[in-house]
């Protein structure tokens, strides 16, 4: 154990950060696979609620270790908006994962970087030049390529895009709140509000989970928390410009999980469109992190 720890610490920050981020993409993909499996048994609103609830429970020890004084805030309304947008994003994200192939849901989720560009320009006064406009149009073309064989946008596709837009809004809220509040404060209020918000639609479609479903719900939530933790650790030790492209390996893991667990085989147009979206998103992330990096490490799928 000691030798393994020394070997790990002897690696460069880039290597350690890359390992953490790659591990997070694997765990997020497994979480999505369990969510999709649960979605065939219970409603997506119920799956989203338990993900939010157990996520809140799992982060409580970390939050309270920082002390209750760290939960004070002078911007409760902004926390409320951030939590509501986050809760809506969780519900949309789980609906998309359950009703779309996992690879498609993952690829459409990456469009959050494209939504972030105009939002950051409007709310954070960041640059919005011709090159970034072209990048957004390229990403939109990728979305159209993915949906063309289906004869248009499915409802689940629109929900996936809405989730990406909501996540982009959450990132803006995080950027504004992080200047005055601690990470523990951000995580606590966002998790609590998201759990309360998702509880309402969950009650409308409630179905008592079986013993197996309870185990799957707990495992899914634990995977989400572990993935989030790995993601944060990765970005804590290495630069975002190096790590951000690695996040897109999630598409490969999601495609593998979809194939082996559900028999989903990505079509040629879907993979081509996903490649365009990923390329456009990588360009946005690289230009964003060179100017004003804004990452939301507290909102998981």
Regions from the language model: what does each represent?
Residues 1-23, 56-81, 130, 192, ...:
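Membrane-interface interhelical linkers
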Residues 2, 7, 252-301:
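C-terminal-most transmembrane helix of multi-pass membrane proteins
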Residues 25-33, 60, 83, 87-91, ...:
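Hydrophobic/small/kink-forming positions within alpha-helical transmembrane segments
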Residues 27-30, 68-103, 145, 222-237:
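Specific transmembrane alpha-helical segments of multi-pass solute transporters/efflux pumps
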Residues 33-36, 44, 59, 150-209, ...:
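Transmembrane alpha-helical segments that form core, pore/gating elements
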Residues 95, 112-134, 205, 252-271:
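C-terminal transmembrane-helix exit sites in multi-pass transporters
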Residues 106-111, 177-190, 228-259:
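Helix-helix packing/entry segments at the starts of transmembrane helices
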Residues 131-147, 167, 269-288:
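Hydrophobic transmembrane alpha-helices of multi-pass small-molecule transport proteins
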């Amino acid at each position: 154990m000691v030798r393994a720890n020394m070997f790990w610490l002897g690696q460069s920050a880039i290597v350690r950060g890359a390992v953490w981020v790659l591990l997070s993409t694997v765990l997020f993909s497994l979480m999505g696979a369990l969510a999709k499996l649960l979605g065939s048994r219970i409603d997506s609103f119920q799956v989203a609620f338990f993900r939010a609830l157990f996520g809140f429970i799992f982060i409580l020890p970390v939050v309270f270790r920082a002390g209750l004084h760290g939960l004070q805030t002078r911007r409760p309304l902004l926390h409320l908006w951030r939590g509501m947008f986050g809760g809506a994003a969780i519900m949309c994200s789980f609906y998309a994962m359950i009703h779309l192939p996992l690879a498609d849901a993952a690829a459409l989720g990456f469009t959050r970087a494209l939504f972030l560009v105009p939002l950051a320009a409007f709310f954070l006064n960041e640059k919005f030049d011709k090159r970034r406009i072209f990048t957004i149009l390229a990403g939109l073309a990728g979305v159209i390529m993915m949906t063309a064989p289906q004869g248009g946008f499915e409802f689940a596709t629109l929900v996936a895009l809405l989730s990406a837009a909501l996540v982009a809004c959450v990132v803006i809220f995080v950027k504004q709140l992080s200047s005055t509040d601690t990470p523990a404060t951000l995580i606590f209020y966002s998790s609590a509000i998201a759990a309360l918000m998702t509880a309402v639609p969950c009650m409308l479609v409630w179905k008592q989970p079986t013993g197996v479903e309870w185990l799957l719900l707990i495992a899914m939530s634990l995977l989400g928390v572990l993935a989030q933790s790995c993601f944060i650790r990765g970005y804590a030790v290495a630069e975002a410009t190096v790590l951000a492209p690695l996040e897109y390996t999630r598409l490969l893991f999601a495609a593998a999980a979809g194939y082996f667990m559900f028999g989903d085989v990505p079509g040629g147009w879907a993979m081509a469109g996903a490649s365009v979206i990923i390329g456009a998103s990588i360009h946005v992330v690289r230009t964003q992190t060179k100017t004003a990096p804004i990452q939301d490490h507290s909102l998981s799928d």
